[in-house]
């Protein structure tokens, strides 16, 4: 009885298992079969054609799975139809790709970073669905993943490449659709891949980001949009370069024009000297005046570098540059200022020494102007002239600079102690140091001049250049020698270039034979006051040092109030030190800002004592003592502004 019941049950189970095979749901069976045999069910060689592959597959199928009996099939149909609906079995549909059908190609928009490119040694157009499935299974085996996680995205026929990507197993919503190519390649076993897919030849695997990104970017660049972008970029670059070149050329032109104007303003024109033309055979050899012939004119131009250039011109064809100082057309000898013969040796024109060694008429007239020029201004006139800057500029241009020629200073190597080679002390008012060595005249030299004060008071000031590293000892020797109570410094240590060295100590310093002690520092709004004690042997001197730092670079201050306050403080200290030496004033060259301070100080004393001021006479007096004092027309205007401001603050009782 038990055998009768067990046999139909066993037949039923076999029928169900066979029905699963015929309905193509035989994955479980194949897996078991493959597991037992430890080798794949179907092996295809790449040299076999499709027909031979089909024959081998069908023979293997019949050999392993013999056809069931008709009774079993009829029984099995009833069960399979109810549980496993299946279409008619056609092996060609499973193994061959129908024309126009790409069941395994997904063509999804996967990012390049997630795509893997596999390069094969066989033509892509020879691949069919069967080979693609084998390829997918081999890649999955090399990755240790399920075949369902490997997706063939695109076939590249020209390069014999297959694009694929790997999806994560059990992907949750919100997770990326494909894994990163770099991450997949790290887990790929290339040896397993090549052993599983020998029919595909040599296989090379790489991420698309490295293989194709450069090509894609190049394609984008040379597309229509990329071409336009390149053209726009080149156009912008050319425009920028052109603009920079234009700006550079304009800047060069402005600098050249500025240099030419500066050189033109600094040129010194000496008075034309009439030269006698060669006498004709009909004239007497000793005749000096030949009215029937146009005399030649010798015009000497001294450029800012101190080079003299003699120039001979005929007055009949060339007009002489007008001189700002006009001479009355009186007698010939008076007009010339000398009875020296006008006959010159033309071969000696290259040597300009005689023009320097002998005082020229032009220089004499310039000195006469400096000693006699005057324009007294009352308070209303001072306010009016301050409002007319062009009148002040014209007046300033008439004042001779009275610079000194280096050959007038008979001291060897004196140039080593000059900050600027064209700014030299006037020999008549030069400060001479007590010689350290009688045989060394250079030890007596310092670039400094005594300056007269109000009413021509002798040695009221000393105007000097900013000390250099090799003249600091000379500077302190001069302060000690002259017993100066006050030092006024109107410059920073550096304004683009060095203007002055730090010549005082922080606490204590020894300079030559003079010891300098700083005993107090007082910081004011626009200047710093230091109380100094100078010692030499058993003797001491007290000196106040004013360092004015509010003067802007390359222009005059906007307000004269700080300079006026400095001047009043210095004047108070000077009066408190009656009987001592001159006030030492310096900037960098010792003529520009130094001249402004001294001229303002003298003018304020004149306003206080007389109620009027003669700024023109004051500046001329300064230039007699030191050439170039009050260096520019802007500084000349600034002096008038400072005097006008001081005058407005004077009370009627103060004016005498």
From Swiss-Prot:
- Glycosylated positions are 23, 128
Q: Which residues form the signal peptide?
A: 1-23
PROSITE patterns xrefs = TYR_PHOSPHATASE_1, TYR_PHOSPHATASE_2, TYR_PHOSPHATASE_PTP
What is catalysed by this protein? O-phospho-L-tyrosyl-[protein] + H2O = L-tyrosyl-[protein] + phosphate
Q: Which InterPro entries match?
A: Prot-tyrosine_phosphatase-like, PTP_cat, Tyr_Pase_AS, Tyr_Pase_cat, Tyr_Pase_dom, Tyr_Pase_KIM-con, Tyr_Pase_rcpt_R/non-rcpt_5
- Give residue ranges for domain Tyrosine-protein phosphatase: 392-646
Q: Would the keyword Ligase turn up in this protein's UniProt record? A: no
How would you summarize where this protein is expressed among tissues? Widely expressed in the brain, most abundant in cerebellum, midbrain, cerebral cortex and hippocampus. Also expressed in heart and skeletal muscle.
Q: At the top level of its lineage, which domain of life is listed?
A: Eukaryota
What EC number(s) does this enzyme carry? Answer: 3.1.3.48
Q: Which residues lie on this side of the membrane: Extracellular?
A: 25-225
Looking at its record, which EC class is this enzyme?
hydrolase
Q: Which UniProt keywords apply?
A: Cell membrane, Cytoplasm, Glycoprotein, Hydrolase, Membrane, Phosphoprotein, Protein phosphatase, Proteoglycan, Receptor, Signal, Transmembrane, Transmembrane helix
Binding residues for substrate, per the UniProt record? 553, 587-593, 631
Tell me which residues this entry annotates as catalytic: 587
Gene Ontology biological process terms in this record: ERBB2 signaling pathway; in utero embryonic development; negative regulation of epithelial cell migration; negative regulation of ERK1 and ERK2 cascade; nervous system development; neuron differentiation; signal transduction
| Induction profile | By nerve growth factor; isoform 2 is induced in adrenal tumor cells 2 hours after exposure, levels are down-regulated 24 hours after treatment.
Membrane topology (Cytoplasmic): 249-656
Family affiliation: Belongs to the protein-tyrosine phosphatase family. Receptor class 7 subfamily.
Q: Which PANTHER family match?
A: PROTEIN-TYROSINE-PHOSPHATASE (PTHR46198), RECEPTOR-TYPE TYROSINE-PROTEIN PHOSPHATASE R (PTHR46198:SF2)
> What does the record give as the function of this protein?
Sequesters mitogen-activated protein kinases (MAPKs) such as MAPK1, MAPK3 and MAPK14 in the cytoplasm in an inactive form. The MAPKs bind to a dephosphorylated kinase interacting motif, phosphorylation of which by the protein kinase A complex releases the MAPKs for activation and translocation into the nucleus.
| Quaternary state and interactors | Interacts with MAPKs.
Report the protein name in the record. Answer: Receptor-type tyrosine-protein phosphatase R
């Amino acid at each position: 009885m038990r055998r009768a019941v067990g046999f139909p049950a066993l037949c039923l189970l076999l029928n169900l298992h066979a029905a699963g095979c015929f309905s193509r749901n035989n994955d479980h069976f194949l897996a078991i079969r493959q597991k037992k045999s430890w080798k794949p069910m179907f092996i295809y060689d790449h040299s076999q054609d499709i027909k031979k592959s089909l024959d081998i597959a069908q023979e293997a199928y019949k050999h392993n799975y013999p056809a069931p009996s008709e009774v079993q099939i009829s029984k099995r149909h009833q069960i399979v139809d109810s549980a496993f609906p299946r279409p008619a079995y056609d092996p060609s549909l499973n193994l061959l790709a129908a024309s126009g059908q790409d069941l395994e190609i997904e063509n999804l928009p996967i990012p390049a970073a997630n795509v893997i490119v596999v390069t094969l040694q066989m033509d892509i157009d020879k691949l069919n669905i069967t080979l693609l499935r084998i390829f997918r299974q081999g890649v999955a085996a090399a990755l240790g993943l399920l075949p369902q996680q490997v997706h063939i995205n695109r076939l590249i026929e020209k390069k014999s490449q297959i694009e694929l990507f790997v999806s994560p197993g059990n992907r949750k919503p919100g997770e990326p659709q494909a894994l990163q190519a770099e991450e997949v390649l790290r887990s790929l076993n290339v040896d397993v891949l090549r052993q599983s897919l020998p029919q595909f030849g040599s296989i090379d695997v790489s991420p698309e980001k490295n293989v194709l990104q450069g090509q894609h970017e190049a394609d984008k660049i040379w597309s229509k949009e990329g071409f336009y972008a390149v053209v726009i970029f080149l156009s912008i670059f050319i425009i920028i370069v052109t603009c920079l070149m234009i700006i550079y050329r304009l800047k060069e032109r402005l600098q050249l024009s500025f240099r030419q104007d500066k050189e033109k303003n600094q040129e010194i024109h000496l008075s034309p000297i009439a030269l006698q033309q060669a006498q004709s055979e009909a004239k007497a050899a000793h005749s000096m005046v030949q009215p029937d012939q146009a005399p030649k004119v010798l015009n000497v131009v001294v450029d800012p570098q101190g080079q003299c250039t003699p120039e001979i011109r005929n007055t009949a064809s060339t007009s002489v540059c007008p001189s700002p100082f006009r001479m009355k057309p009186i007698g010939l000898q008076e007009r010339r200022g000398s009875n020296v013969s006008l006959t010159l040796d033309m071969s000696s024109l290259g040597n300009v020494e005689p023009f320097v060694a002998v005082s020229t008429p032009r220089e004499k007239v310039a000195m006469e102007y400096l000693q006699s020029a005057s324009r007294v201004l009352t308070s209303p006139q001072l306010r009016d002239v301050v409002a007319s800057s062009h009148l002040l500029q014209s007046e300033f241009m008439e004042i001779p600079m009275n610079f000194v020629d280096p050959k007038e200073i008979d001291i060897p190597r004196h140039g080593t102690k000059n900050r600027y080679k064209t700014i030299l002390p006037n020999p008549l008012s030069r400060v001479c140091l007590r010689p350290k060595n009688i045989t060394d005249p250079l030890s007596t030299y310092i670039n400094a001049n005594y300056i007269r004060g109000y009413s021509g008071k002798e040695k009221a000031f000393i105007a000097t250049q900013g000390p250099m590293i090799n003249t600091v000892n000379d500077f302190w020797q001069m302060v000690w020698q002259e017993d100066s109570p006050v030092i006024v410094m109107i410059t920073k240590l550096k304004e683009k270039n060095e203007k002055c060295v730090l010549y005082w100590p922080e606490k204590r310093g020894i300079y030559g034979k003079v010891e300098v002690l700083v005993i107090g520092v007082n910081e004011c709004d626009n200047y710093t006051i230091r109380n100094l004690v100078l010692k030499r042997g058993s003797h001491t001197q007290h000196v106040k040092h004013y360092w004015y730092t509010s003067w802007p670079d390359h222009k005059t201050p906007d307000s004269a109030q700080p300079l006026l306050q400095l001047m009043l403080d210095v004047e108070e200290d000077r009066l408190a030190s009656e009987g001592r030496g001159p006030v030492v004033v310096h900037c960098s060259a010792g003529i520009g800002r130094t001249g402004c301070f001294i001229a303002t100080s003298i003018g304020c004393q004149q306003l206080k004592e007389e109620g009027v001021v003669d700024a023109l006479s004051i500046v001329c007096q300064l230039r007699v003592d030191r050439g170039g004092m009050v260096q520019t027309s802007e500084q000349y205007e600034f002096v008038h502004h400072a005097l006008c401001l001081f005058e407005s603050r004077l009370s009627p009782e103060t004016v005498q």
